[in-house]
Every structure is written in structure tokens, then in C-alpha cells.
């Protein structure tokens, strides 16, 4: 089984980034969206109407710097409750802004929350993947996508995803220098790559090999049914 899940991060960060994510959903280029529920621009209605699967994009940066220990657990609980208030349900999956959810001092409260609500968690490397699976948490087999703007917007693994569930992390958006994001230009590049890929797919070019597109929830449901 080869499955590709395309996840757009940072919904709620900035209005023009929200627009880019919604545009990517409309063109059929995104399956899942990670929402930043503590941000003032996390408006639920357009995302709910889009039909995309919605997860929680956890933030552990407080006013005075990174949170850990009891403050981190409190921050996660508050964000989980806020997600429920906004979207009327639990998140379908969990991941973290700048992969904060994978930091050793923060991984445990994230795993405990995932266990509580029955949600998969994004794994950022093989060690993190093994750690989650040892605790019974579903996680994709591979994460692709760039963390820095100098990396290629179209990952080479996309042409031939390996067996299992591959998650492609993207940050589509329309540029806006007022956002304050150091990744501003790269968001426009990500959106352009998604547009290009969907155009190629429209003409039956095998842009992701023989992988099947899916949401995370559906991918793990099928995996369970087949095992």
C-alpha cells in the first residue's frame, strides 16, 4: 500500500496564508490542514466548509519563551479545548509548529493527548516514529517537505513514495511582508508547486507514482482494516 497525504500547516497564522491554504484545498492539492487555534486569524467557518480534514498545530512558545513541564501540559489542554470550541470536535491529528511536539521534554504530553482522543501524531524522524509506535500511537511512515526555504519546494521523494503512508508537509500561502514570517516567500513558492503538480496530474502525469491520495484518518482506518 502506497498512500500520500498532503497536509497544509499554519492555518490561522495570517489572512493571506489562510487564503493560500483554502485555494490549495479548492484545487484538490491538500487533504489535511493543521490549525493554529491560539491565533486571532484562525477562523473556523471557511475551513469547515472546505471539507478538509482538520488537525491541531500545537504551539509551545509562550510570552516568555518555550514552555515545558506543567505549563506545556496546560498549554496543550487549553489549545485542545479551544479547538473543540472552534470546530465542534476533537482534532483528527496532532502535530507541532516547527516540530515542537517532537522535543523530548514535550513529546510525552502530546502522546498522552493523542492517546486520549485517538488521534495520529506526525513523526519527524525514525527515532520519534519508533517512540510513538512503541506507545501505540499511529504515525505516518515517512514525512517529506521542507523546513527551510532554501530546500526544494517539490521533494524528490514525491515522484515515487515508498510503501506505507507518506505525509507531505506544505505551507501554501500568498505573500504578505506584514505577516512577520521569515517563511513568507516560501509559502508562495509552495502554493505555486501545488498548482503545477495538480496541473500535471490533470493530464495524467504520474506526479506521485502509484500512491493513493488520502486523509490521515482514512489512511489509518484502511490500514487497520487490512491488518
Question: Whereabouts are the PLM-identified features?
Answer:
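Terminal accessory/targeting
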Residues: 1-6, 15-59, 64-93, 105-227
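Active-site histidine-anchored catalytic micro-motif
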Residues: 95-98
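His/Cys-centered metal/cofactor-coordination and adjacent catalytic loops
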Residues: 10
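Active-site pocket-lining segments that scaffold enzyme catalytic pockets across diverse folds
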Residues: 101-103
